[in-house]
């Protein structure tokens, strides 16, 4: 029987492939209830997409703050080779502190996770000063000198820097103007003759003025009156526009794209912001109430780097893996389960179905690379559920249940995107019903 020509063929083929994949490929032994005794530590070690907070390397630390760099995404696995050009840095500082002027050899996407900041970008014709609040983001081009101030008297500042490397893939290097115990000023590497000619001054004066070691580190205490003077010229991020070419923008500038009583997702895509378009990156902010479930879904193009900012989450990610048995190459389904706590990072590859449950009130941020023209396809819920778009005639041949039974099953869930994480339909044995679910979807149980 013919079905509507308006139904997109690519969507039909993709969903049919997902639903029927277990008929062609072996399941990895993570069916419902199995491997429940596997320890969290063991699961983390076997999960190449999970990066615990202890995977950050400390680049600098003193009594005023710290700068940490996450290990390379592809350091322990070839599965994340597509992320070799990207690095994640975390900057934390105490109140009334300054990160000294420097420039990076990589493009940076700066995102404020906690607190407030004064960011000053220096250019040949002057400087731009911005006040950044929680949720603000801005792109800093490679080679741009900048410095950061925590102007608050009480609250710490925490910033996530997402680096896009290009000079040496996967390597981020910062060049500081000042001389510290850790590293001298890069100006000191020039010869005396070059410096004297450049500044038209004797070397002793240049050394005393610019090169002598003065600071214990690159994060220093700053007097309040000096902070107030710099703050007078600071511009705040605009919550009315997302398309500024060079000014900060806020993740919650617009209404959430998904929202109900269980959670919200704010998202800015490359199509809506020129800074993100230059980097081919999307940004989102996920907020969920304790016990809520972000239903199974997948991204068509974007690989999302999910950062746990506040709270705890239980995440299940489904992927396909190559396997060789008796000289024959086959594929198998694999469920990667993890509990994320503050500071942990999970990589969600494109096309990998994922579901997430809030173990407490939850706040997470996501950075999606290769994000242009990305689509998020839901596998459950009332709205934007791609399975609901499959006509009954095709469902008859796709699922164990009839097309009518599939439609009835999908009608049970009245909510969309975020739902109650506790199943309502429980059998006599205390287990959630999962009749007529193909193996792909049983991996989420």
Curated annotation (Swiss-Prot):
Domain of life from the UniProt record: Eukaryota
InterPro entries: Cupin_1, RmlC-like_jellyroll, RmlC_Cupin_sf, Seed_Storage-Functional
Domain Cupin type-1: 49-207, 249-407
Signal peptide coordinates: 1-26
Molecular function terms, GO-annotated: nutrient reservoir activity
Intrachain disulfide bonds: none
Signal found in the keyword field: yes
Keyword Cytoplasm: no
UniProt-listed Pfam families: Cupin_1
Keywords assigned: Seed storage protein, Signal, Storage protein
Family the entry assigns: Belongs to the 7S seed storage protein family.
Function: Seed storage protein.
Complexes and interactors: Homotrimer.
Protein name listed in UniProt: Canavalin
Organism the protein comes from: Canavalia gladiata
